[in-house]
Amino acid sequence: MLSVVEYAVHQLGVKHIIVCGHYGCGGIRAAVSGRSFGLIDHWLQPIRDLARSQFDCRECWSEPELDRLCEDSVAAQVERLARTPTLQAAWGSGKEVSIHGWIYGLQDGLLSNLGCTVSQGD
């Protein structure tokens, strides 16, 4: 997946990367379920770690809490992407690239900017 970002930034000159999550995410629900899902557990672990650091451990999650975890996960992914060698090299060479975190509401169709943009020098 990072090869796509590298190609977009270094070859195509993409200036904006959007990390977009969505409310009602099955991955978020799976991560907090306490169950193992085999190979995808590797992808769920960062969400589990985030949930543990942001919320008290629990078995029941309210919809607003799950929504907030969706938002927090997007913000964490923006930060993680900003730390990759690909983006660090792009910024180091003077490329103007911004990473934006957005969230999509499946119920209302609204796309919202989470305000967690990272750009060169941030």
Name what the model sees in each region.
Residues 19:
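Conserved functional hotspot residues or short segments at active or partner-binding sites
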Residues 1-15, 26-122:
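Divalent-metal-activated hydrolytic enzyme cores
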